[in-house]
Amino acid sequence: WDTLALLGITRSDVVFLNDKARYKMVLVGSSLTHDGLSNTPPHTKVFDIINRLQGEYDGPEKIYVSRRTWMHDKTGNIGTNMTEARKCVNEDEVAEYFISLGFEEVFCENLSMKEKIGLFRGAKVVAGPIGGGMVNTIFSPPETKVISIDSPTFFDINTRFEYSMCHTQLHHFTDTEFAGDSTGWVEPGDVGVLSISGGLNSPWKVNMDSLKEFVSGI
């Protein structure tokens, strides 16, 4: 509802389907994450809509997008919470490094839509482990520097995340590795689906020496 309100669409403008009405035509949008189109480039009109969204937030110029949900334990606003399954096991060290560089740690799950739009529109440098929070760079202007710390094999199937960031000054850091067993599995009977546990959704860690060298060169 927050996003619709920012586009001038109120609750009274929304009509829900019901079994007492007959419709001559119904247009159903495709899933952004779970069908054959999820990893194809978005239509250009998508960005026309996104750019209409206005946010307000007096935030810092350098932000670290944290996945350390254990710091506050508020996960109700996370759609699919993979912060524990695909946990960066040395993120405490990663976060403290960026904080030492003057970055402010932010938790997107604790912000409203308007606050997130304002935060990412205003930030000049954005860094963090790849995940839902980093996708908010879709609101960032082209001149924003973005440092995406990529977990192993994540972008093998999650190209849609790239499309939310590639309009910025994007830098991928890839010197990461799985931390322990990364064997993937799915529930019995789920034929032809991606691993829902293990695999790319396994715990991982960052090579800190390599990260520091990488960041110093940007």
Q: Which sequence ranges carry the predicted segments?
A:
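The feature primarily captures lumenal catalytic ectodomains
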Residues: 1-218
